[in-house]
Each structure stands twice: as structure tokens, then as C-alpha cells.
Amino acid sequence: MRRVDNGAVKHDAGERINELAEQVLTQVDGLLGRHHIVPNAVQTQMLTSHVRSMAHRSITGEPLPEVDASLFDEISAESMALAREIVAAFGNLPDEEAWLLSVHFEVAKDNL
């Protein structure tokens, strides 16, 4: 939905969220391809949903619930680095987002 205000076209938050999510999902696809990580259909669906939620939090400023860092001690440095690269693309999300996102990469790496 677009709204016109004094002649300027404004996108509503939902449209901005979708645009950001699609942009970042394109980056995720490229990143996965470069690292030869191939998620299965269910993993892809869950990853897509997570990235869309991240886009929502990025646009709305909605915070994550508190996350216990120790839950991610067994995540590989590679998966964490990939997740941090994606989180950096948003430009305004906390590092805890990378902790959560890294799980998707870690699980998908096991498909090889």
C-alpha cells in the first residue's frame, strides 16, 4: 500500500519490510551458494521466515527477547561469521540476531 503525502509517495512499513527481506534473502542465497551450503526445503522455509522477521525488527525497531549466548557455544566459527555478514547487511540489528541466524547455517551445512 502506498500513501501520497504532499505529492511524495511513501511506502508503508509492510512494503518496506518486504523489500528489505527480499534484498537480504538474495544476499543469503548468494552467500549460501559461495559456501556450497544447500538447505533442504524445510530449512529454506524456516530461514526465509527468520530473515523476514529480522527485516520486521529492523524496520519497526521491535527488540528480540533476551537470548542466552551460551546456547550457541557449539556453533562453528564459519556459521557465526556467515550469520554476522547477513546481520551486518541490515545495519541496525544486534549481534544476538547473528547467534540465532547462525543455527540455520550450521544445520544446513550438515546436508552435505
Question: Language-model segments: which ranges?
Answer:
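A cross-family "folded-core" feature that marks the main globular domain of proteins
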Residues: 1-112
